């Protein structure tokens, strides 16, 4: 019997395509090595560098006058700062990078830290041991000599170096520091590995009467110690152990959830009583969403049915919600369980909770001292471990709605790095040489971008930079949009700060961050409420354009307004819980990919990307850079729970989950090399696409995996030193043969002598636009008949510290990823789904029969 014309109805499971995966050897394709010389006179440049180096290094102090401490395993040496030359004014180069090859590891000449400058140069702190001075000077001298017909030695090391200079006492500090300030505060000291060096520095610091906390964070290349003292004291200690410390940061201490309240909220007891009678508790084995916040009012009639546990990082704090004016953890948990309560209050239907909530108090109540050290990386890892000990085995995700304002998001922090470890299953004690990374449990975590407070519209409405730790690569970062614009009645002299279906004025983004060094954040948007603006242009929160949730004052004010990205994270937690309840069988990486795949831009935002006809907007207002910037403000849109869970006949989603070994030990037994890639000859609905001919169709590809972070001073300018491994995807071109596609991706694949015709790219970003992050998403928009030829995709590795840091013995480790591909023809009476599943069934039979 023929199916009814319900082409848009979502009633079909997503389509697994793992049976189409083929593993192949991967070799990085060779590139044209021809390059233009950057120096007109190399001898003069070498002489210039030698002169500057001599001044920067100074004389080696006599033993009797040497202030440096003798630390076992640490060579005595000096730190100098090098800066690259700027690119040409007309160059499209993002920056002239500090060369990776600048280091001589066998001599312990190493880059401690690097950073991007506003003039598109980069600077680095270079440690030069005393016994390596002559070696380094000799290499620079050789670089300056005429090589004759040979290649100039070390040109890749020294050619771009413009300046070498001595450092000052504050050079190791990240950000501005007042060395005269008497305040005794906590500092992060980033210490080079091995861990034994950090242990020796602890002893040295304590011998100098500096307070060092026992807690620490451990990353592959760095151990983070926490010292308590004045800036000058810490700086003096650092100058006495040059080469041991890569950088010094003020320990995170300003956690600022959006907690302002204002006028009394509008909760009423009869509303709560009526709704609570309609609520059915979730099953005991249902997924849970754990909020890491200010605690929870466990007795609240709307919280109690779904609450599966409430604890505190420090038991002395108690698990109740200590935040005044209605709490913060309680309304967050309310949104996690129910979403916005306003539509439920205006309804009469039963409410069945699909998932539970847990609360772990992460922040100390008023009157309690701050945690020591004030490192929310340490605290968050401890909190997550405690929850999992209390209720082991639960399918669980985590929500963080708090942020810190005192650290720039352009580089990883100890908090964002700690989140990346949590999510990847790589906290201290979790990494086991006998267990592949792919087999360790992973965690899904949603994190707020941080908030923009009220103020004048001219200051509030332009998107502001992210707050720490939302730059985390592995976390799903949540921004805000709003559908709320109704002013309070009777009409005052107020109007909504932004129209409905725009980015919420509370939300932050990453468009001001370097797109070659940082991930696209936020990835998605959820309802965050709006601001109201008065006649002077002043914007601020208002209950009429906020969400409604449970309040911590159960007897006095059980319902309160809740807003900003804290509310958006609560809504995201609700979405995650519902998705995990519907699909408990898939990985956290896959849940994250499906959330992003399901997202669509509201119409006013969509018009910023899409022009008339088949293509994306073009022109000066829609360059690749402008599109990247818009993504960094709006993400990939607002997720749709039905789309995330189910496909339709004209909107099919294909899903793959796979393990991959990105690297292996090379033939020399000493270096890491690329190992394997995956090809998918996709079950492509060519017949249906060709029948649609020139109709507009959209394809979305999302690749999701979790990296293990390596927090080093170089991570800010070298994404490949921060990630353990990286993956990318590329799709077969419309006119490309399968053999040509394979050889284009990997040098190890045989070439067929053909070239793809020049074709207009229909991708929003294109395969070369992604440099950082662990979730990569791109959209293809064009004619259906053109999409018919894009019937294969490759997933291949890019570098990471597993490959470059052979001494860590992780080269041959296995990773895993989720790949989601959706093809959407909304409004079209076309059955993409059935054609795809027919091909999948045929392939499965073929494999079964051998």
Regions found by a protein language model. Give the residues of each.
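Short glycine-/aliphatic-rich beta-strand segments at the starts of folded cytosolic domains
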Residues: 58-91, 174-193
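Substrate-binding/access-modulating region of protease and related hydrolase catalytic domains
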Residues: 196, 363-472, 485, 556-563, ...
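Subtilisin-like serine protease catalytic core
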Residues: 277-311, 318-375, 393-398, 407-410, ...
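Catalytic-core environment of secreted peptidases
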Residues: 294-318, 481-496, 501-569
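Short, small-residue alpha-helix embedded
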Residues: 568-582
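Secreted peptidase-domain scaffold signal
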Residues: 618-728
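Long mid-to-C-terminal assembly/interaction modules of large eukaryotic proteins
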Residues: 696-850
